Amino acid sequence: MAVRDRLRARPTLLVPVGTTEQHGPHLPLGCDSLIVERLADDLSAASGIPRAPAIEYGVQPPTHPLPGGAALRRKTLHRVMNELIESWEEGAGVREFVILTAQANDAHLEALSTIRTAEASVVLLDVFGLDFGDRLVTPRPKVAGGELDTSLLLHIAPAFVAHDLVPLELAASSTKGEALYRFILERLKERLLRP
């Protein structure tokens, strides 16, 4: 089905927003982007809602000036998102935007949660905002390059993980990543598909 027909049936667009940030020596640059792009693909397939190309740059903490990383300021990301959403709202008739991100930085989330539109609604789905309960050993799942990121990447993109550099103290595995991914996907589908 063409994008135009899908938008007529349900004028909703998934917009994955990642970051180009280093998550330690064992994970690839753009780890957050890989996670949200895979989730956006699977959510789109499950719901029939088209997804926009990923926005690969976001706001990241100034304490992470590692090689290869590149960030936008909060105001810049906010402006870029407002302009893109205005374009999709006016040009394609989109009336609901589902922003999907996996970056726990407060400024990043603020930029995405304060988007303004003429008529459309904007929903922000933050992977790290989910309650993982006892699914993680690490009490702080939002740590870049930690148990959550590493397990997810070991599941969805194992070729991009430097297995020999994964910290031994991390309770990360591909099996855990698969279970976490299924949990995340189901929670997001519940939010996305609720009437």
Locations of regions flagged by a protein language model:
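Extended, histidine- and acidic-residue-enriched regions that form the cofactor-binding/catalytic faces
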Residues: M1-V98, A102-P195
